[in-house]
Amino acid sequence: MTKRTLRGSVRKKKRTSGFRARMETPTGRRVIKARRSRGRVRLTTV
């Protein structure tokens, strides 16, 4: 049996694509704005 090579890290995910990370940059804020306008239930992952 081979071991899993891809293990997701919650901390890394939050730091790169979390809500607060998105709000730091102008393009990230644009992403949130676009997702809000589309009526997304989840604005960000994690």
Curated annotation (Swiss-Prot):
- Which of UniProt's keywords are assigned here? Ribonucleoprotein, Ribosomal protein
GO BP terms in the entry: translation
What InterPro entries does the record tag this protein with? Ribosomal_bL34
One GO cellular component, as annotated = ribosome
Q: Please verify whether the record's keywords include 4Fe-4S.
A: no
Keyword Transferase assigned to the entry: answer is: no
* Compositional bias segments (type: Basic residues): 1-17
Recorded GO molecular functions are: structural constituent of ribosome
Where would one find coiled-coil regions in this protein?
A: none
Region span, Disordered: 1-26
Q: Which Gene3D superfamilies match?
A: 1.10.287.3980
| NCBIfam families the UniProt entry points to | rpmH_bact
Family in the record: Belongs to the bacterial ribosomal protein bL34 family.
Protein name stated in the entry: Large ribosomal subunit protein bL34
- Which organism is the protein's source? Pseudanabaena sp. (strain PCC 6903)
